[in-house]
């Protein structure tokens, strides 16, 4: 992703320059041209202005008298001077630039009625903008837009944004969250300057620009939460192994973004997209009031996230999520109300777990939990509408009745169960929602959602009876399938003895937990401590590359999966998930013959059939890479080798269980092909 200094512009850069020169370019057009690549330095200012929607905005400072006379003016001047001193600016330009920066901060304080303080971090927000050498009016407009759209309100110690981040961390990494909680290391104590400066506080100018290139094009203020999450996830092993004092650990955490390099940013965003795709939409929808200038929707009972036991999900999302196809968030709903309430009426897909049992009959409760986990596993495997990797607990919606449910929730969280949420408002909210959308209407698709196992009925149920999938099991508790990615994050590294030029082999042993390589072919990662390990393997770059090199005819070709697997020339078959750049995953099969590798993508609506998504010659594989923290996420790069280097033509990513075995087999087959060609 590095910029090519002095290199001739590529075709996409020319397209971008022409589009920007013509004017009238919108963000969608810009995104389609850039496709996640790092911006050329000379075009960055124009792209950022489009992304911030300030193109054509007037000069807000035009009517201002220019008086620099705030009570805290001396502090503003001092901070601005320190910024100028750190910049490589010609002497004759320093005074003008200093006045511009000081004017921007002063006018913002006056117009917004805000008292300036150095701890606000505005100087760090301005630093990447100052590097763009913008006119004063554009500098102010860009600064204002960033403050308004991307810096959340209450971004201070014990502020609401950090309570929300803790809930997100707990949702994806309960073990890490619990560890930090016990150490009383709250997110605001280490991430205040991450969020308040959009990482510019600790990151170099080049790294900050690369982060902002992607972040501003995302146009999603909540995406910063997932970037923060990945930084923690990748420091997890080091954090959990720490035995130092709290202050030293906080310093380590707070400064961890400083270890980022430009080459890491593509992977940082890719992993953030993955976690984003595994997060309920309610995370955004219920907290949209954090960003923007509007104060609408801010209520006292909405803002106190510090007391939340876990992430809350709306009942409308629960109903919609389990009807959709594809790789979105799907919920396995656990109804924790007493048996008589459950029998009178319940969500037809809900599993019943009587929370009263936790105190009244602990052994029966433990057996019910085992049954729950087994039922969840079976419902996922069978493709049931009730199936989902995400556990969502539903109570009655009455605080005094839900006390035991909260104890059950705490039980699962203490067991470090990932993807645990609560249905906001409980069953009462579900009933109200179904009433609001007139569930009894003949054309409404939700009519089957309420079921009863007794003679009594809810006032708004349908005529469909149904039981929960309440099967018992003597087996051990089953971990959620979502551990595909996150189990790999919890493991420790081992050395890989065999190194092959141009290949990274990531081996795994046949036990429950995967192990990953700590060796790397190519340049070693900067620094001694493994603080941040995205990119510890060879980097891959999708600049100018179509992620799939097959023709339209290939896309349309439908084949029988088993027939293809049984073909005599197929040497290996690896069930996997194809991973797209947006984080979406598609169940697939990688088939390896003597000379080729095929990706068959399963067709959800046609069991046993698949599209030929990709066919690649083995001798066109120029690189196989994996990530130290994600040994199951494998990237294949295809291309040609010539005197001027390697030309990459296609890049494909797969999430492969036992990826070490798969890459080893593929590598050996590639070597056979290359040996045959040489002989």
Swiss-Prot record:
Keywords: Developmental protein, Golgi apparatus. The keyword Calcium does not apply. The lineage of its organism: Eukaryota, Metazoa, Chordata, Craniata, Vertebrata. It comes from Gallus gallus. SUPFAM superfamilies: Rhodanese/Cell cycle control phosphatase, Ypt/Rab-GAP domain of gyp1p. Residues 38-219 form the Rab-GAP TBC domain. It is found in: Golgi apparatus, trans-Golgi network. One of its GO terms (biological process) is retrograde transport, endosome to Golgi. Residues 454-468 have a biased composition (Low complexity). Residues 327-439 form the Rhodanese domain. Putative Rab GTPase-activating protein which plays a role in vesicular trafficking. Involved in endosome-to-Golgi trafficking. Acts as a bridging protein by binding simultaneously to golgins, located at the trans-Golgi, and to the WASH complex, located on endosome-derived vesicles. Plays a role in brain development. May act as a general inhibitor of innate immunity signaling. This is TBC1 domain family member 23. GO terms for cellular component: cytosol; trans-Golgi network. The keyword Transferase does not apply.
């Amino acid at each position: 992703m590095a910029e090519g200094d002095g290199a001739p512009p590529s075709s996409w850069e020319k397209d971008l320059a022409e589009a920007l020169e013509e004017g009238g370019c919108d963000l969608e057009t810009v995104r389609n041209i850039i496709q996640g690549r790092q911006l050329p330095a000379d075009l960055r200012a124009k792209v950022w202005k489009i992304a911030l929607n300030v193109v054509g905005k007037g000069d807000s400072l035009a009517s201002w008298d220019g008086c620099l006379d705030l009570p805290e003016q001396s502090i503003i001047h001092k901070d601005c001077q320190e910024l100028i001193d750190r910049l490589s600016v010609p002497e004759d330009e320093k005074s003008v630039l200093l006045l511009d920066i000081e004017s921007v901060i002063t006018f913002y304080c006056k117009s917004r009625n805000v008292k300036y303080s150095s701890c606000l971090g505005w100087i760090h927000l301005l630093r990447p903008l100052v590097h763009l050498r913008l006119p004063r009016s554009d500098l102010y407009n860009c600064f204002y837009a960033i403050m308004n759209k991307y810096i959340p309100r209450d971004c201070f110690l014990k502020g609401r944004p950090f309570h929300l981040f803790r809930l997100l961390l707990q949702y994806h990494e309960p073990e890490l969250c619990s560890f930090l909680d016990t150490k009383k290391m709250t997110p605001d104590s280490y991430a205040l300057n991450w969020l308040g400066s959009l990482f510019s506080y600790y990151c170099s100018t080049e790294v900050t620009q690369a982060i902002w290139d992607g972040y501003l094009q995302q146009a999603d203020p909540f995406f910063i939460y997932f970037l923060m999450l990945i930084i923690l996830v990748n420091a997890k092993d080091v954090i959990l192994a720490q035995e130092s004092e709290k202050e030293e650990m906080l310093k380590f955490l707070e400064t961890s973004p400083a270890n980022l390099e430009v080459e890491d940013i593509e992977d940082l965003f890719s992993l953030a997209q993955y976690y984003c795709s595994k997060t309920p939409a309610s995370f955004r929808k219920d907290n949209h009031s954090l960003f923007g200038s509007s104060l609408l929707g801010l209520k006292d009972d909405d803002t106190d996230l510090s007391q939340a036991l876990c992430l809350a999900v709306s009942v409308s999302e629960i109903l919609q999520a389990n009807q959709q196809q594809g790789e979105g968030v799907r919920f396995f709903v656990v109804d924790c109300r007493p048996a008589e309430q459950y029998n009178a009426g319940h969500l037809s897909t809900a599993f019943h777990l009587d929370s009263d049992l936790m105190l009244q009959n602990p052994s029966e409760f433990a057996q019910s939990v085992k049954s729950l986990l087994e039922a969840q596993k079976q419902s996922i495997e069978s493709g049931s509408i009730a199936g989902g990797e995400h556990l969502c607990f539903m109570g009655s919606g009455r605080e005094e009745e839900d006390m035991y449910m909260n104890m059950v929730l705490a039980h699962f969280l203490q067991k470090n169960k990932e993807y645990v949420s609560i249905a906001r408002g409980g069953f009462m909210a579900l009933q109200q929602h179904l009433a609001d959308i007139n569930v009894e209407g003949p054309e409404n698709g939700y009519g089957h959602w309420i079921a009863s196992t007794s003679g009594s009925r809810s006032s708004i149920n349908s005529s469909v009876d149904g039981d929960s999938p309440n099967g018992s099991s003597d087996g051990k508790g089953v971990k959620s399938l979502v551990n595909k990615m996150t189990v790999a994050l919890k493991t420790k590294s081992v050395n890989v003895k065999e190194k092959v030029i141009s290949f990274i082999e990531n081996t795994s042993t046949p036990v429950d937990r995967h192990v990953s390589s700590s060796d790397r072919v190519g340049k070693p990662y900067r620094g001694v401590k493994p603080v941040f390990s995205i990119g510890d393997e060879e980097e891959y770059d999708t600049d100018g590359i179509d992620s799939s090199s097959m023709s339209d005819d290939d896309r349309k070709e439908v084949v029988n999966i088993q027939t293809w697997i049984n073909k005599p020339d197929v040497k290996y078959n690896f069930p996997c998930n194809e991973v797209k750049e947006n984080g979406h995953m598609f169940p697939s099969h990688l088939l390896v013959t003597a000379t080729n590798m095929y990706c068959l993508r399963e067709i959800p609506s046609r069991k046993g059939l698949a599209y030929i998504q990709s066919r690649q010659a083995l001798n066109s594989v120029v690189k196989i890479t994996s990530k130290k923290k994600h040994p199951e996420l494998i990237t294949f790069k295809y291309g040609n080798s010539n005197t001027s280097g390697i030309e990459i033509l296609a890049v494909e990513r797969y999430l492969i269980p036992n990826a070490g075995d798969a890459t080893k087999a593929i590598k050996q087959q590639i070597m056979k092909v290359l040996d045959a060609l040489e002989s």
